[in-house]
Structure formats: structure tokens, C-alpha cells
């Protein structure tokens, strides 16, 4: 066993009667003994399916309390879990399988029903924490003779997560048992977590935020966990009060919704004496200062901003609870952070450049990446721009890359463009992020039509409809703009920053 699986196993076996994870949709707490039953049942399933060390299981499920036990069962055997969005269209799910040949998929009833390939065997699985469909590639599994049952090592991968690249092809981040345990330990220590804490998880379980920052750090601290299907502004404060939630990790969009939602404000007014939040952690993109102050004043709860990413298995910097600096991403914690200017790494105050990170929780390469330009001399180059102030606090000032950040989701423009290119009336296009008060950025499709000035309303609606049916919800354009030509450089490349400024300057509307 690895240090990670030993810790997780001991936690369940040493506290059998303790309630440790609650599923909000089921309105039920699960004891450590019940979770251990699920771990055993899933582990037996994986073994019966001829899975072993190094195999990858694709998981496409809604948020629930089953995720921690799927992980633990798989990690005990050296199996790697790759969670993806449950809103992934069936075409996307099959494309993933065609590329990576997963021997087993755990998914929803709807996606299993749409999966009609005869080579796959489908069966229902019920455990304490969830019901799901199991799709097995019988052609791969039935005649296996080379299953690896050797001892799992700390350097073995346990989790694969997708992170968007500028090419539009998602990059796969492989996180080892060692990396995840280190990251979760840093998270727990920096946020002073104890077994008296209860974390509420609203972020999707195919994100590093939910997987490591919230779930795994809580288990490292022997804290309790409340898993919700998704964020609900109107139910937020009731959930916090009823379940004695002490902290939650969010994106700035959630902070905005809580401030704006009348039901949320009314609920807080009724329940204020029952709310015991120590802090709310906010990351993904900067929270406007006036919104941060408004939240802290209205809800009497500290907001801690930090900076992290999938490649770091969680956070790299965080504001100290006793000395937060509004507008900053805080101080490095468990991470070396430098600013790259030309070929020189520096931490000099005021030096603006690309943020580079290094640490025992940071990956050293992407999976299947033949050109590791993001890695240099042991540093991971984030593609984000920033600087340190005179006190060593990091300020993130934008992205060197073109990735769109929408409510915490990362959207690759090239991927959206490749899908929309199927529409015959698009002559040229560029997908960019435009400022949005709630989501940080909105996915905006800018195009030159084959019929300029004609049928724009119909074409706009067709793009929005086509996007909703062919892309994940967070990738779908919510805004469409028409232009006669794009700003370009001397080689013909579209100048996206100039295009963005052009739309802002003319006050373009949806």
C-alpha cells in the first residue's frame, strides 16, 4: 500500500461508527463502516473485471458521495481514475474511449442507454452511496492474461484530470499518489483544518478543486464532508447551518450569486446565529475587491483567495488567514514560485512576467505530451502573468495563454471553433472570452458570415443551439458577434486581444 491508501484505509477502519461523508441529494450521512463496504464492493468489481495496476477507469457521474470510495477502491489496486463532466455528450464519451481504450466506464443511466455498441456489456451497480451503470469492454477484458497485481507504489498515478490547452486538445494531467497526498497535506495545513471541520463540496468532482482541495484535504485532516449535486444559492445557507459546515471552496461566480440572490440573503438573515463558517476559499479568477468586501460585510465570513491549478494538484499560493491582502493570491505555501522574464527567474518586487512553480505536488510533464514546452529546468510555466509585491504576496494579472475562464471552467477556443466550423455559413471565426460580472468571462463566438449583414439573427440562434447540443454546457457560446474582418498580424494570425478590445470599444451587445 502507498502512504495515501494507508491513510485512507486506516481512517475508515479506525472509526467505523463515525459519520464522515453526507450526500446532500440522499440527505444521508454515511459512516466509515458503510464507506468501507462500498470500497470493498467496488474493489471486488474491479478485480472480477480483470482490472489491475495501471488500468484506467473512466468515470462520468454526477456529484455524489460515491467519488471518494471509487477513488479509494481503485487506488488500493493501483487503478487510475479519470473523471469527466457528466454533461459530456455521448459522442464525446465515445471519442474519449476511441482514443484511450478504457476497459471500464462508470456512468449515468442516460449515457449508458445511449451507448449501443454491442462489444460492451452493461450492468447496474448499487452501493450504499450511489447507483450507477457499469460499461465493460468485454473484448479487452475477457481474455486478459497479463493483469498486473504487483504492489502499488507512491509514484503510481491515481488520478487523471483534463486541463485545456491552447491547441484545443485537452491536456491530460496525471497525478500520483505522492503528489496528491502532498497537495492535500499542504491544503489542510494552510487552512488549519482539523477533525472538527466540515467541508461542503459544490464544485464538480471532475475538477481538482473538489477532488483534492476539498475532498482529499478533508480526509487527510480526518474532517467531515458534505457533497452536494451542485451549487444552489437559495439552499446554500440552510445547508451550511444544518450540517455545521465550517468552510467551502468556491469560484467568484458563487460569491456573486450569493450576494445577488434574494432567497440567499433572506435565508442568511434567518439562520445567521446557526452559521459557523470559518472561511470561504475563492479561486480560479480574481474576485473584484468591492464584491469581496461586500460578502465579508454582509455574511460576516472571511474570504481567502488563492492561486492553484490542476498541474499543481491544488493550490500554490494562499492568503494567510490572519493577514489576507485583498486583491492578491496570497503567499506561496509548500511551493516555490518565481516570475520568468525572458530567461531569468526572479521574485523581485514589481517584476511582471510569467508565473512559474515548482514543488512536491507539481507535475513534471503532461501525459502523452511530446513537446513539454511548459516545463523548464524543473519549473512548470503556468502561462499566467503576475508579480510579487514588497511583502511577497502574488498578484495575478492575466493569462499569457488564450484559455477562457468561465465560472471556474477552462475553455479552449480552438476546440469550440472546430465544433462550430461544421456550420456552413461561418466563413471565418474566433472564439474569445469577453468580460462577465458573474462568470468572469463568457464564451463569445465572433465570426465573418458567408452572407454579411443577412440573416444574422437566425445565424446567431443557430450557433447558440448548435453549441448547446454539441458541446459541454460550460463550453457552449453564450454570445455571438458578427464582424466584417478580423484584426491580423503580418502572418495572418487573428489578433485576439485586439479583437476583444475592438468589441469592448464599440460596446457590442448580444
Where are these regions (language model features)?
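AMP-binding/adenylate-forming catalytic core of the ANL superfamily
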Residues: 88, 359, 364-365, 385-474, ...
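Conserved AMP-binding/adenylate-forming core of the ANL superfamily
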Residues: 20-50, 55-64, 68-72, 89-94, ...
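Conserved pre-ATP/AMP-binding loop-to-beta segment of ANL
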Residues: 16-17, 143-162, 169, 192-198
Amino acid at each position: 500500500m502507498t502512504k495515501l491508501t494507508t491513510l485512507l484505509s486506516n481512517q475508515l477502519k479506525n472509526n467505523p461508527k463515525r459519520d464522515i461523508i453526507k450526500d446532500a441529494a440522499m440527505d444521508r450521512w454515511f459512516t466509515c463502516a458503510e464507506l468501507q463496504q462500498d470500497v470493498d464492493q467496488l474493489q471486488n468489481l474491479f478485480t472480477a473485471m480483470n482490472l489491475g495496476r495501471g488500468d484506467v477507469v473512466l468515470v462520468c457521474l454526477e456529484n455524489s458521495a460515491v467519488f471518494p470510495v471509487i477513488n479509494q477502491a481503485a487506488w488500493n489496486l493501483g487503478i487510475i481514475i479519470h473523471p469527466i463532466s457528466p454533461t459530456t455528450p455521448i459522442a464525446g464519451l465515445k471519442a474519449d474511449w476511441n482514443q484511450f481504450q478504457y476497459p471500464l466506464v462508470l456512468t449515468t443511466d442516460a449515457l449508458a442507454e445511449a451507448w449501443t455498441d454491442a462489444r460492451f456489456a452493461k450492468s447496474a451497480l448499487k452501493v450504499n452511496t450511489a447507483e450507477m451503470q457499469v460499461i465493460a469492454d468485454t473484448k479487452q477484458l475477457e481474455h486478459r492474461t497479463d493483469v498486473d497485481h504487483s504492489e502499488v507504489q507512491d509514484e503510481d498515478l491515481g488520478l487523471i484530470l483534463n486541463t485545456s490547452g491552447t491547441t484545443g486538445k485537452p491536456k491530460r494531467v496525471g497525478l500520483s499518489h505522492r503528489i496528491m497526498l502532498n497537495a492535500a497535506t499542504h491544503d489542510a495545513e494552510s487552512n488549519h483544518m482539523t477533525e472538527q471541520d466540515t467541508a461542503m463540496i459544490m464544485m464538480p468532482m471532475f475538477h481538482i478543486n473538489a477532488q483534492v482541495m476539498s475532498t482529499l484535504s478533508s480526509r487527510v485532516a480526518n474532517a467531515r464532508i458534505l457533497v452536494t449535486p451542485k451549487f444552489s444559492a437559495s439552499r446554500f445557507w440552510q445547508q451550511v447551518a444544518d450540517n455545521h459546515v465550517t468552510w467551502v471552496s468556491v469560484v467568484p461566480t458563487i460569491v456573486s450569486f450569493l450576494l445577488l440572490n434574494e432567497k440567499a440573503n433572506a435565508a442568511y438573515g434567518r439562520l445567521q446565529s446557526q452559521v459557523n463558517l470559518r472561511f470561504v476559499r475563492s479561486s480560479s479568477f480574481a474576485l473584484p475587491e468591492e464584491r469581496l468586501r461586500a460578502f465579508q460585510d454582509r455574511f460576516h465570513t472571511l474570504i481567502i483567495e488563492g492561486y492553484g491549478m490542476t498541474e499543481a494538484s491544488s493550490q500554490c499560493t494562499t492568503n494567510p488567514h490572519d493577514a489576507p491582502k485583498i486583491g492578491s493570491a496570497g503567499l506561496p505555501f509548500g511551493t516555490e514560485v518565481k516570475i520568468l522574464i525572458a530567461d531569468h527567474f526572479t521574485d523581485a518586487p514589481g517584476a511582471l512576467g510569467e508565473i512559474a512553480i515548482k514543488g512536491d505536488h507539481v507535475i513534471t510533464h503532461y501525459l502523452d505530451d511530446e513537446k513539454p514546452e511548459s516545463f523548464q529546468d524543473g519549473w512548470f510555466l503556468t502561462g499566467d502573468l503576475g508579480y510579487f509585491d514588497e511583502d511577497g504576496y502574488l498578484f495575478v494579472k492575466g493569462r499569457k495563454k488564450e484559455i477562457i475562464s468561465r465560472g471556474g471552467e477552462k475553455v479552449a477556443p480552438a476546440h469550440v471553433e472546430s465544433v462550430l466550423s461544421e456550420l456552413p455559413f461561418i466563413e471565418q471565426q474566433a472564439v474569445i472570452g469577453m468580460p462577465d460580472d458573474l462568470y468572469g468571462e463568457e464564451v463569445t463566438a465572433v465570426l465573418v458570415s458567408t452572407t454579411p449583414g443577412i440573416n444574422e439573427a437566425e445565424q446567431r440562434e443557430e450557433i447558440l443551439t448548435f453549441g448547446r447540443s454539441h458541446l459541454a454546457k460550460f463550453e457552449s457560446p453564450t454570445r455571438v458577434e458578427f464582424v466584417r474582418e478580423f484584426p491580423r498580424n503580418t502572418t495572418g494570425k487573428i489578433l485576439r486581444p485586439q479583437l476583444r478590445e475592438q468589441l469592448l470599444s464599440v460596446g457590442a451587445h448580444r
